[in-house]
C-alpha cells in the first residue's frame, strides 16, 4: 500500500458542497481534498465558498472532525485584465484551510504579461505558504508543457510550479522526455486520470472530454506508469476524474470517489 498523498479533486464530485466533499473523501479513504474557491466556468454548479462564511465554518468543522487535509485550491485564471491583488482573498482562505498548492490557468495570449502576473501571484502567495501551479491545457493560451515552462522561466520565481494533469499531458501531445528535465521542486503535485481513445481533431470535443468524460486509472489508453515514473517519487496525486455518464446512471459521489481511489491504488502497486 502506498503512503503517497491521494486527494479527491472537486471536479470528480462537483455536485457536492465542500463539507459533503470532505465527508465523502473521508468515507472513501482519501487523506486530502481539493477545494474550488472559484468556479472553472460560469456554467458549472458552484458553492460560493469564498463569500459564504457559514459554508466556510461548516467546511472547517468537517475537516477537523474527519482529519482530512486540504491539498490545493482552484482555479485562478491569468487573463488580460487580471488584477493579481484581487486573488488575495483566495490565498487567505486557502491558507486558513491549510492548502499548500494553488491551481492557475493561463488565459492570456500575451506571454510576457501572463508571466509578469504569474510572478506577482507568486510574490502574493509566498507569505501564505502557497505554491502557484500553472496548469497547461490544450485549449488555453498555455496549451502544453513546453509553453508552461516558458512562462515559469519568464516569471523567475522559485515558488512557481507546473501542474501536470494526465488528461492534458496526453491531449496536448507533451513528451515524457521533456518532463524528465523539469526540476522536481517545480512539480509539487499532479492530477491523475486516464484517457480513452486517440486525440480528437476537434478542440471542443477535447474540452468536453476533459470536463465530462475521463476514465479511472487503468481504464483508458494513457501510459500512466510512464507518466508517474517521470514525476518525482511519491508526488501527491489529485484524482480529477469527472464521469458524467456514471453520474447520469445514478452512481453516487461516494461510489465514484471510491472507484477512483481503488483504481489509483492498483496502478501505484505497479510502479
PLM region spans:
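Glycine-rich, proline-tolerant flexible connector loops at the mouths of alpha/beta enzymes
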Residues: 34-58
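Active-site-proximal loop/turn and secondary-structure-junction residues that shape catalytic pockets
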Residues: 12-14, 37-39, 77-79, 107-110, ...
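Active-site acidic/histidine proton-transfer and metal-coordination neighborhood
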Residues: 20, 62-69, 77-162, 171, ...
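Alpha-helix-loop-beta-strand connector modules within alpha/beta enzyme cores
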Residues: 50-71, 123-127, 222-229
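Conserved beta-strand positions in the central sheet of alpha/beta enzyme cores
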Residues: 34, 72, 103, 133, ...
Amino acid at each position: 500500500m502506498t503512503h503517497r498523498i491521494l486527494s479527491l479533486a472537486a471536479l470528480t464530485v462537483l455536485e457536492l458542497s465542500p463539507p459533503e466533499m470532505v465527508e465523502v473523501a473521508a468515507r472513501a479513504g482519501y487523506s486530502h481534498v481539493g477545494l474550488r474557491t472559484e468556479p472553472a466556468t460560469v456554467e458549472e454548479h458552484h458553492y460560493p465558498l469564498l463569500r459564504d462564511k457559514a459554508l466556510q465554518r461548516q467546511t472547517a468543522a468537517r475537516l477537523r472532525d474527519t482529519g482530512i487535509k486540504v491539498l490545493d485550491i482552484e482555479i485562478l485564471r491569468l487573463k488580460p485584465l487580471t488584477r493579481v491583488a484581487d486573488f488575495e482573498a483566495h490565498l487567505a482562505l486557502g491558507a486558513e484551510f491549510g492548502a499548500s498548492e494553488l491551481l492557475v490557468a493561463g488565459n492570456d495570449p500575451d506571454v510576457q504579461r501572463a508571466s509578469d502576473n504569474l510572478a506577482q501571484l507568486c510574490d502574493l502567495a509566498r507569505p501564505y505558504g502557497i505554491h502557484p501551479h500553472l496548469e497547461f491545457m490544450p485549449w488555453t493560451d498555455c496549451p502544453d508543457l513546453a509553453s508552461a515552462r516558458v512562462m515559469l522561466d519568464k516569471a523567475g520565481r522559485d515558488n512557481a510550479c507546473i501542474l501536470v494533469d494526465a488528461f492534458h499531458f496526453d491531449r496536448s501531445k507533451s513528451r515524457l522526455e521533456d518532463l524528465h528535465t523539469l526540476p522536481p521542486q517545480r512539480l509539487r503535485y499532479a492530477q491523475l486520470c486516464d484517457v480513452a481513445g486517440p486525440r480528437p481533431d476537434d478542440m471542443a470535443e477535447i474540452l468536453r472530454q476533459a470536463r465530462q468524460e475521463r476514465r479511472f486509472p487503468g481504464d483508458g489508453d494513457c501510459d500512466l506508469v510512464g507518466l508517474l515514473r517521470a514525476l518525482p517519487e511519491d508526488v501527491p496525486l489529485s484524482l480529477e476524474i469527472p464521469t458524467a455518464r456514471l453520474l447520469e446512471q445514478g452512481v453516487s459521489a461516494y461510489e465514484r470517489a471510491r472507484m477512483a481511489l481503488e483504481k489509483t491504488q492498483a496502478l501505484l502497486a505497479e510502479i
